[in-house]
Each structure stands twice: as structure tokens, then as C-alpha cells.
Amino acid sequence: MDLTGKLLIAMPGMGDPRFERSVIFLCSHGEDGAMGLIVNKPADLNVSTLLEQLEIPSSSAAAARAPVRLGGPVEMARGFVLHSPDYAGKLQSLKVSDGFVMTATLDILEDIARDNGPARAALMLGYSGWGPGQLEAEIGDNGWLTADADPDIVFGSRDDGKWEAALKLLGIDALLLSASAGHA
């Protein structure tokens, strides 16, 4: 089962507080493990502040307001931009699926600062990673649900409500979801 390009939705009984109510976009998934980006955990800075810290001049009003998110607990000083496929990065862009591309170079930040970036983008610091078989075991233990990725959830600017919206993709009302899970 290849879950690349899908959403992981944390179940209410998620034992790890770093992933409580998380929605994660899976950038890669295979026999060597999985890598994803949390799309609904805000960082304590916005893109404008990050551009200042990186000494990248910005003339973009949109970048000034754009949030930065915590993509996960691994390599939190490393940045990733998940974006729409309309942007053709110069180097190292990974097409994840038809509607999503990931770029991890400064080029995209410079282009975003000049309003030459992708139409839709989400910037994350750090990522979430799983070793071989680890994610499958967590799914089997009812830690995660999976759903098709929705660009409005992934790229939406408001983080509150993304978890509930992701559950609705599966026809699930968050208020009716139990923190306890069983196996039939």
C-alpha cells in the first residue's frame, strides 16, 4: 500500500502529543519508510519573519501574512515548501502527486518573496518520519486514518478546523469519534 500524496489524520487516542489532532501530507511512503509534513501546526513566525532571518528581501504582501507551520519533529531547522505544480523550481523539486510538489531549496523562498512563486504554497519547518513498517504498524494500531489529499486543507491559511475538515473527507464527524479504538 503506497500512501504517497495522501493525508494522515491523527485519531483522538494518539499517544504522542506532538501529533495530537495532526493532519499530515505524506510526501513519500515505501518499503524504506515514510516522510510527511504536518499541515495544521503553526510555528511562532510567519514567512516575512523567516525571510528577514534568511536575509531575503521581500516585496510580497502575501508572503508577509503567510504562516509557517511545524512540519514535524525531525530536522526542525530545515525548511520544506509544499506547493502547487504551476511552479517549476530550478532544482530539487519532487512531484509528489498530480496536485502537489515539494521543494526544499532557497530558490523557492526567493521567488515567493518576489511574487514569482507558486499559486498555492505551505512552508514547513521540520518533517515527520517513520522507519520501515513503522507507519503501517501505527495505522494498524488505530493511530491514523488516511484520506485523499484536498488542496484546500493542505494549502488553507487557517489551521484551526483542518483536522475536522480532513475527517469530513471520510464522512466522519469529529464529535462522534471516540478516543478508544478496538479491533473486530
Swiss-Prot record:
Lineage, opening ranks: Bacteria, Pseudomonadati, Pseudomonadota, Alphaproteobacteria, Rhodobacterales
The family this protein is said to belong to: Belongs to the UPF0301 (AlgH) family.
UniProt-listed HAMAP family: UPF0301
Cellular compartments per GO CC: cytosol
Protein's name according to its UniProt entry: UPF0301 protein SPO0296
Highest taxon listed in the record's lineage: Bacteria
